[in-house]
Amino acid sequence: MAADGDLRERIAGAEHDQGNWQDPNLAALVAEAGAAAKALAGEAARGLKARLSVGGRVSGRALDGAQEATHGLAWLATYAESLVQLGDWAARLTREDRFGEIERLVLSIGAGEYCAQILGGIPMN
């Protein structure tokens, strides 16, 4: 897995390269992004747990006061798993020789949007 800075640079570069959806390594890049996002979500969960723990246990009162943070963590974990599943989907279709232009565009748009939001801010409602 690439270091966070390296992955951030690759994702940011991909956002500016309109032809990147044709990259034959797109599925691998999405799988890498999914792994990095899952690692980030794991770090965020550990950090939040440490912040909310009192005496080695998560405090209900602290949890009540951190609803925005826990909601954000849930969204981050959801986006991370979505990237993993998108990467798996693309790999499966590639093995079956069914990964065409439409699938590549779906992958590029979906993964690109999730990566952009992970890096720039996840909108919550």
Predicted regions and their residues:
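Flavin-dependent oxidoreductase catalytic core characteristic
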Residues: 1-125
